[in-house]
């Protein structure tokens, strides 16, 4: 008996300036609305959180580019990610005829996490994803709903947890790959993974894991791109069909960097 072909699903992750500046957000929403078939949008919003925290007199503490989420900061990121940024995106998509539904991990228990254990650094109320309810998401998607997921999860004990948006996108794509033929696209402000960070045209068109390790050793790939690529390889190895890292405005092109096993 021939195996039934899976329906296609696109998971798009956006963050940074893209979701926080009106012009780039509007362009993104136009491009996202034009994606055919099933889709999910995962967003960040760290710069907005830093800005609002400063206005409230709360210092933002960072270690190795990662936010320390103390009790006061958790209130801010819950307001900003789950409220301001998420609902702006949902409203913008509804205006474009996309039946978007804003979700945090706590909503309908869609993503449960465990508070990150203290090792060298205490990151505070930060969650490491334990499970994604792919059945719930699939049911919503098959009803024509487009989930818009904020970078917040919960621990099942009444506590919200700040959670990396790249990780949420990767874990969501992995969970849904059992049901759909999933393409995961990480959008950011560069055209892809660059050989030379000062040359926007030096895009590496595709990269496998051995090349990734070599580029790290050579210092070509460093900083925040390392965890982004680690998430990408985990997704590919877990059954996601395709992972692309690209410019937000290029999601309808063949540009960017494609991740291979």
Swiss-Prot record:
Family label: Belongs to the acetylglutamate kinase family. ArgB subfamily.
GO molecular function (one): ATP binding
The protein's name in its UniProt record: Acetylglutamate kinase
Lineage: superkingdom: Bacteria
Function field: Catalyzes the ATP-dependent phosphorylation of N-acetyl-L-glutamate.
Keywords noted in UniProt: Amino-acid biosynthesis, Arginine biosynthesis, ATP-binding, Cytoplasm, Kinase, Nucleotide-binding, Transferase
EC code: 2.7.2.8
Site (Transition state stabilizer): 13, 228
Compartment annotation: Cytoplasm
């Amino acid at each position: 008996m021939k195996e039934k072909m899976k329906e296609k699903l696109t998971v798009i992750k956006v963050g940074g300036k893209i979701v926080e500046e009106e012009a780039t957000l509007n362009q993104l929403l136009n491009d996202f609305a034009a994606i055919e078939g099933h889709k999910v949008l995962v967003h960040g919003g760290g710069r907005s959180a830093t800005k609002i925290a400063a206005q409230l007199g709360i210092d933002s503490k960072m270690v190795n580019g990662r936010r320390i989420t103390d009790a006061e900061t958790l209130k801010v990121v819950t307001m900003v990610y789950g409220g301001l940024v998420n609902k702006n995106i949902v409203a913008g998509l509804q205006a474009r005829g996309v039946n978007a539904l804003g979700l945090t991990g706590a909503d309908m228990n869609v993503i449960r996490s465990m508070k990150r254990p203290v090792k060298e650094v205490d990151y505070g109320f930060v969650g490491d994803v334990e499970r994604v309810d792919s059945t719930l998401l699939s049911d919503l998607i098959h009803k024509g709903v487009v989930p818009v997921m904020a970078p917040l999860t919960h621990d099942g004990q009444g506590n919200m947890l700040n959670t990396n948006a790249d990780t949420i996108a990767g874990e969501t794509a992995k969970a849904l790959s059992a049901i759909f033929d999933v393409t995961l696209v990480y959008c950011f402000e560069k055209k892809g993974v660059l050989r030379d960070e000062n040359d926007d045209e030096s895009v590496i068109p595709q990269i496998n894991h051995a090349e990734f390790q070599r580029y790290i050793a050579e210092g070509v790939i460093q900083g925040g791109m390392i965890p982004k690529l680690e998430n990408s390889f985990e997704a590919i190895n877990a059954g996601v069909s395709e992972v692309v890292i690209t410019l937000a405005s290029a999601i309808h092109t063949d540009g960017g960097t494609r991740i291979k096993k």
